[in-house]
Swiss-Prot record:
This is UvrABC system protein C. It is found in: Cytoplasm. Residues 1-23 are annotated as: Disordered. InterPro entries: GIY-YIG_endonuc, GIY-YIG_endonuc_sf, GIY-YIG_UvrC_Cho, Hlx-hairpin-Hlx_DNA-bd_motif, RuvA_2-like, UVR_dom, UVR_dom_sf, UvrABC_protein_C. Residues 67-145 form the GIY-YIG domain. Coiled coil: none annotated. Residues 14-23 have a biased composition (Acidic residues). The keyword DNA damage applies. The keyword DNA repair applies. Its main location: cytoplasm. The gene is uvrC.
Length: 681
């Protein structure tokens, strides 16, 4: 949650982006993806006993294909999925690959690598399109257009399962009863909005368990961020009116809400109740603050996503703006992985199908240019959403102005990305030259530990590559070993490295370093699982420990390990570097490679500290009831409502526990025994 939890239970939301929201989520696991499609009736058509490949294989495969719609997959010799495609007629579409016509380099290479194919039929072409998009996202084939940085979008949730609804930031499935508003482009946008809504409507942000056990108002009530429904500082009717106003504001009726508050402010002034008038004035200012961050709020666009693409220099940027209830909920730039030779319209077409694979579809989608399968895409998304979806390219009026604005944003983001990518390529090349690497690294892993006297110890791993930091590859390691003494950084690093590379060996096997791809080939390959270089925050002692681990695992020749020791007085710019085959050395103070390494080390430090703080915070707020098997949120809430605190629960007798709603004799005895070692009554 992007906010600061106060000691007495309320939450103050801040306005920064929650950068690590998805950093600890593993990238889509290939085995899991395979299981998700294993239930489909995939048909290999025929048994390739003669070892055919390429055009010869496809030509034979076509003979066994039906004329019906469906999806096909192409595999290489190693069993990796090269491409997933869909067709109105499988026979005609796949047959195109086997004809002698001139293909693009990308298609020719894909055909040449193909050693096996499978297909599955669908009832309609729209079904085929949706299945294709789903498979591409999960299998991430090398030759498809791939959506990257596919983080879920945050929403604002106003709950409806309590007498006093609360307001929260929400991601994921909509399991909880309530009203959801969004999507917002970032956690920062949600934080800003909730922060202002707290000031404007005084809605609580505490959890239900805190709310039910309050005996006096919390700090948020004192600073006028909450109306205090927990202790009835506001009547239920008055609080319900505040919640209604908040919902109306988020539903697009902002002007009506502001007019009503302004009227109340004027009435208070006329009654010479200036203190109450000041409260209404502050509420109006908070609402204006929300709208000032929304930029354009077009009156003619009620619910729409607006997409624009700029394709140049081998990089595509797709910018999307979200409009809901006539309000702009923010924007985000995407840089899909695609063949540079593909036209922008084809990239945008493939992007849209994948984008909406797991996201709610609005009633209207506006594009900067026409895509090939516009009607089919609209029909497929409408079928998925359960309502009509229109996809159009505006030619005039307000919608055209909005689309042009989104396109201008796409061009600006594209220019920034192009500059960053060019700079990153130069830095990686300089890094390789500085450390005498045989090739430019594509994946660098940086490790750091964080703890306080050995408690809540966490190891952090961040990843950098040709396009900067790759946050969906970040990992945290909660130190589990009980043999590590407080402050034993060597022991912590040993555990982290052993766990990391043991799992990598199990899942990926050893990398083949004999076949290093050229820069051109590397650009077409998926991001590698194995690091080319690991950076360790430490000197000779840390490096000795790391080398010993790599030797034990038999991967010393697979990974280049480099130690980065802080300079005298821990001064930046005076770092010493430790690498195999050479004496330790320093870099000139203004060397770009030195700044690059410092930035990577600082990011690892930030991530490790953030993970440690999150673990420590979780430990501090842990409830003793959480440790009892069979006590879920519902029973815990009932116990706390009945007894007031967890300490009172621990002192309760067996008969007292049995009087609580939802607590049977068996569960009561389990709770009692947990807090009393003797287990007797």
């Amino acid at each position: 949650m992007n906010g600061k939890k106060l000691p007495d239970g309320g939450i103050l939301f801040d306005e920064t982006d929650d950068e690590d929201d998805d950093a600890n989520l593993a990238a889509t696991d290939t085995a899991e993806a395979s299981r998700s499609v294993a239930g489909m009736d995939w048909n290999a058509g025929w048994k390739n006993e003669s070892g055919l490949k390429g055009m010869d294989l496809i030509g034979e495969f076509v003979k066994h294909l039906p004329n019906s719609p469906g999806v096909y997959r192409m595999f290489n010799e190693a069993g990796d999925v090269l491409y997933v495609g869909k067709a109105r007629s499988l026979k005609k579409r796949v047959g195109n690959y086997a004809q002698g016509r001139v293909h693009s380099n990308r298609i020719a290479q894909m055909v040449r690598f193909t050693t096996h194919m499978e297909f599955v039929t669908t009832r309609t072409e729209t079904e085929a399109l949706l299945l294709e998009a789903n498979l591409i996202k999960r299998l991430r084939p090398r030759f498809n257009v791939l959506l990257r940085d596919d983080k879920s979008f945050p929403y604002i949730l106003i709950t409806a399962d309590n007498r006093a609804p609360a307001i929260f930031k929400h991601r994921g499935a909509r399991a909880r009863k309530g009203d959801y508003f969004g999507p917002f482009a970032s956690a920062g946008a949600v934080g800003r909005t909730i922060n202002s809504l707290q000031r404007a409507f005084l809605i609580r942000t505490c959890t239900d368990s805190v709310f039910e056990t309050r005996t006096r108002p919390c700090l948020l009530y004192q600073i006028k961020r909450c109306s205090g429904p927990c202790t009835h500082e506001v009547s239920d009717e008055g609080y319900a009116e505040l919640v209604k106003e908040a919902k109306d504001f988020l539903s697009g009726k902002s002007q009506a809400v502001k007019t009503a508050i302004a009227r109340q402010m004027n009435e208070a002034s006329e009654d010479l109740d200036f203190e109450r008038a000041a409260i209404y004035r502050d509420r109006l200012a908070a609402l204006s603050h929300v709208q000032s961050h929304q930029g354009i709020n077009p009156a003619g666009i009620e619910e729409a996503d607006v997409f624009a693409i700029h394709h140049e220099g081998g990089i595509s940027c797709i910018q999307v703006f979200f409009f809901r209830t006539g309000q702009n909920w923010g924007n985000r730039a995407y840089f899909p992985k695609a063949d540079p030779s593909l036209p922008g319209s084809e990239i945008l077409n493939a992007f849209l199908a994948q984008f909406y694979d797991d996201k709610p579809v609005p009633k209207q989608i506006l594009l900067s240019e026409t895509v090939e399968e516009q009607e089919l895409l609209a029909a497929a998304l409408g079928e998925k959403a359960g309502h009509k979806v229109t996809i159009s390219v505006p030619q005039r009026g307000e919608k055209k102005d909005i689309t042009d604005h989104v396109l201008a944003n796409a061009r600006e983001a594209h220019g920034r990305k192009l500059a960053e990518t060019s700079s990153q390529a130069r830095l990686l090349k300089g890094f390789a030259e500085t450390f005498n690497l045989p090739y430019v690294p594509r994946r660098i892993e940086i490790y750091d530990n964080s703890h306080i006297m050995g408690t809540n110890a966490v190891g952090g791993m961040v990843v950098a590559g040709p396009e900067g930091f790759v946050k969906n590859q970040y990992r945290k390691f909660n130190i589990k070993s009980t043999d590590i003494t407080p402050g034993d950084d060597f022991g912590m690093m040993r555990e982290v490295m052993t766990r990391r590379f043991s799992r990598l060996l199990k899942e990926e096997g050893k990398p083949d370093r004999a076949q290093t791809p050229t820069p051109e080939e590397a650009a077409d390959l998926p991001f590698p699982a194995w690091p080319d270089v690991i950076l360790i925050d430490g000197g000779q002692g840390q490096m000795t420990a790391v080398r010993a681990i790599l030797d034990e695992l038999g991967i010393r020749d697979c990974v280049t390990a480099i130690g980065v020791a802080k300079g005298v007085d821990r001064e930046a710019g005076r770092e010493r570097f430790f690498a195999d085959g050479r004496s330790d050395f320093s870099l000139p103070p203004r060397d770009p490679v030195l700044y690059f390494i410092q930035r990577m080390r600082d990011e690892a430090h930030r991530f490790a500290i953030g993970s440690h703080r999150a673990r420590r915070k979780k430990e501090m707020v842990r409830n003793p009831l959480d440790e009892i098997s069979g006590i879920g949120p519902g029973r815990k809430r009932s116990l706390l409502q009945h007894f007031g605190t967890a300490k009172a629960v621990s002192r309760a007798g067996l008969n007292d526990l049995m009087t609580v709603t939802g607590i049977s004799e068996t569960v009561a005895r389990q709770i009692y025994n947990h807090f009393h070692e003797s287990g007797s009554d």
